Amino acid sequence: MDSLETAFSTDPRAQQVFTTICNALDHLGLNRHTDTNSDGSCTAHAGVISDEFRLRLIFTVRHQIDCITLIVALPFTAPIPRRMWAAAAVCAVNLKLFEGLFEYNMEDGSIFFRMAENYYDAQIGEQQIRAMCYKATHFIDKYGIKLRRFCEGVVTLEEFLEDIKRKG
C-alpha cells in the first residue's frame, strides 16, 4: 500500500475526491505529481501557463475537514518599500471577487490565490475541478498583472485603486 492509499484508508470518500482531482488534471493535459503531507492530507501539484504567468496549481484534500483547497502562488513578491501598501491593494482586489480570494504575506511579500470547496454533502466531479482551475487562472490573469505592476512601482496605489474601481 503506497502513502496515498494509507492516507485515505479510513476515508474512501476523500480517496474518490483525490482521484477525481488527479483525473481532471490529467484530462486537462497537465503534468502532475502527488504527495502525502504530514497531517494526513494529500496534494496534487500541476504546472500551467496562463495568459500572463507560469503557475503551479496545488490541490489539497483535507479529509479531516472534508475540504479541497486550491492554492496558486503568484510568481512575484512585493518589495519591502511597497509591502504595507500591497496589503491594501490585495484587499481592494478581494472586494471584486465572487469566488476565491487573494492572500498576502506581509512578512515576505508573497501573494497567493486560494479557492476552497467542501465535499461533505456534495459530489465533486471533474467538471467542478476544471472550473476551479479556469477560475483561478482567470482571476490571476485579470488581477495578477495589475498587482505585479503595482508591486514593480509602475503604478501608484491611487492609480491601482482607480483602475480596480473602474475596470473591476
Indicate where each model-derived feature is located.
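Short, internal acidic amphipathic alpha-helical interface segments
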Residues: 73-110
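Long, hydrophobic, amphipathic alpha-helical segments used as structural scaffolds
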Residues: 98-101, 143-155
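Charge-rich, low-complexity N-terminal segments
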Residues: 1-56
